Swiss-Prot record:
Gene that encodes it: CCL13
Protein name from the UniProt record: C-C motif chemokine 13
UniProt entry tagged with the keyword Signal: yes
PANTHER family the record matches: C-C MOTIF CHEMOKINE 13, SMALL INDUCIBLE CYTOKINE A
Similarity comment: family membership: Belongs to the intercrine beta (chemokine CC) family.
Amino acid sequence: MKVSAALLCLLLTAAILTTQVPAQPDALSALFTCCFTFNNKKIPLQRLESYRITSSHCPRKAVIFSTKLAKAICADPKEKWVQDYVKHLDQRTQTPKT
């Protein structure tokens, strides 16, 4: 009886672990989204919601802008317009809303 209870416990633990493992690679890939090409066109500033910088694990440093329609757009951080947009978005998030 004790052996069958221990076996059942072991099987349940294994089942729980195997259902959780496939979700981990997706979570990791979301953390390490890399850009391999850049958007060459200037994006209208009013369409942008936020930005983030790519991980240091990526081959190219990039800014990823998120639009209000939930699209991700890669941009070259060396471009002047990208730097201006980053400053503007930083100021927008620091300004308290009344």
